[in-house]
């Protein structure tokens, strides 16, 4: 079987100008980056704002194994299958971060015969959005340090600057650094650190902004530090939101590419779902809804993280809520949740499937709390057995959730036809009546309790000393009206990555709250989640190369 990159490189690409005609986009509406990538103009986005939105399908998953469960691949395959059965369809995905591409993932543009192309470009520098976000973020850091050096008119306490620098790489050695060393001309010495770009609030803002005006307003509202009197300092106090928006003026425009099957795809924005809100840009999703009859999008990691954040943070900023949710499950992940060791996942074990089903069942129950129709997609692997598949289908029938086998990795659009028909049926026969899990007026404690008890199945929320003080402080500043964004391990419902399945009788401990007032949410840090990842012992980068003619090797 060919590798993902071999499959991608074997597909003859069509000019992007031809691909986007399917959804009413003309060549004049595009800003081209070569023949196969483009950004959509503000003029076109504005011209479709009054169009009635089509159907929205959110793809999520059970708690994943370290290898992932093929959610992006399933999203792409489902979109292609919808196209194949005659539906006018668009895809709206996140763009990959170079850190994980070089680290453990090796690529994030789908897989097999369900990929977005050109995959090498998408996985590397693409249209430069990540670099623009990194530059805007670090420009703000430079402006803060310059303000300190030039007299500190705002009275910023250098010990209480909460704006770290960022880099789109996994580099654990930069988590904590000292800046300003050497001499007085090098600035004010202080503690600093680096996060990965996809954890940046600038990334979150870009993905939640509805236009340039909204982008600038959100940038102005970023909290960067506290004064000596402990009052917050905002970007608007530095008067640099215009400069930051200028750096991002092209990055905010959604990127257009194509799938192997020729479905038009927006690939734009890429916040992580374990340390950020995990969804592609509002601008891309909203525009896709107004151009196509069906839009397929995804939210990162399992439904306890990405889907919860999509429904509580992103959906209020969209023209409409999802009409259906697809939960991707794999038998290998269910067996792992059922207690099987990673080395034994290829062996048949129906008992472990039954035991691990508790994880999938809780995700189904959680999405039902939002009143949205659900379809379970079994992402098929060659090691799956008929007996295991039959058991899973029977278990899904017991909780009255439709389930379909999908083999889009191996068969592309053809492998997703049954799933596409099931999703259309769910949308047609059931009506979504979306409701949020909590209200804006609820306190931060109430919002966190709702997520922990209703979504995670936990017993209670515990607050560390720092978080306790921040709850009082944030309420005084009026930030308690914002939604919450949990920073938590993706592998478990709990904050313990080793606690698999559907655990209960556990508490979640919030160690720190981080204000993301520009993005419009409060991040709650749990466990030992890092906002700057490290590289594994054998990084994917060690298998990458480029040939003398410029052909990429080793991406997957």
UniProtKB/Swiss-Prot annotation:
Keyword Ion transport: no
Domain of life: Bacteria
Binding site for ATP: 65-72
InterPro entries recorded: Formate_THF_ligase, Formate_THF_ligase_CS, P-loop_NTPase
SUPFAM superfamilies: P-loop containing nucleoside triphosphate hydrolases
GO terms of biological process kind: tetrahydrofolate interconversion
Gene3D superfamilies: Domain 2, N(10)-formyltetrahydrofolate synthetase (3.30.1510.10), Formyltetrahydrofolate synthetase, domain 3 (3.10.410.10), P-loop containing nucleotide triphosphate hydrolases (3.40.50.300)
Similarity annotation: Belongs to the formate--tetrahydrofolate ligase family.
Protein's recorded name: Formate--tetrahydrofolate ligase
Protein's organism: Streptococcus equi subsp. equi (strain 4047)
